[in-house]
Amino acid sequence: MNIGEATQAHMDARYPSGEPISAATTDRGRIARMNALEKAHGGPRGAASAVGVSRETWRRWRLTGRDPRTGKPRQKPGAAGLNKLAGAAGQIYRAAQARRAQQGLARARGVRMTGIIRWDGYLNKIPQRTVRVADQMDLTSLYGPWERGDLLALGETFEAAVGREHSASIQVEGDETEVSWT
């Protein structure tokens, strides 16, 4: 795992999305996502508009079980509808995750990294090592690349932040890299 992947793995574990565990294809997962959308958009009308379906379609998706008159299963969204629903709900969950992440990144404590670290172009005698980078550090610059999923930029941004903290250029190499903070 390179520095970008290690940083992303730590951030994903530290700031979970809050998305329901149940898949959107299950009644439970679908209703949970619909509830989140209705809460965020002020009711069924706003939620249906955000997903891009009519209010009537939204109402039918809400129903579960079987129709009492016909005994047939109620209408559920197809693949395209589920993609729309999951995408719109995902934005809601990512926004909440973003708020938590930005607050946590502003006051990261006990920042550590493990890997082959070049300080100003030089390797230490024992190249693979764990370094306590800082007791407290502002890592808000990591948020943008993490949100975009840009691993290369995320790794470079982390290296630059650590370099600023130590007034030195650093480069983390190798595939056995770890990053952590509290």
Positions of predicted regions on the chain:
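Charge-rich, solvent-exposed alpha-helical interaction surfaces
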Residues: A6-H10, R33, K84, A88
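Helix-turn-helix/homeodomain-like alpha-helical modules used for DNA recognition
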Residues: R94-E165
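Short, amphipathic alpha-helical "recognition" segments used to contact nucleic acids or chromatin
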Residues: P20-G42
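Recognition helix of helix-turn-helix/homeodomain-like DNA-binding domains
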Residues: G52-K76
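DNA major-groove recognition helix of helix-turn-helix/homeodomain DNA-binding modules
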Residues: P73-R94
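N-terminal flexible/basic segments that precede or flank functional cores
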Residues: M1-S22
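Long, low-complexity, charge-rich intrinsically disordered regions
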Residues: E156-T182
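Short alpha-helical "recognition helix" segments of helix-turn-helix
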Residues: G42-G52
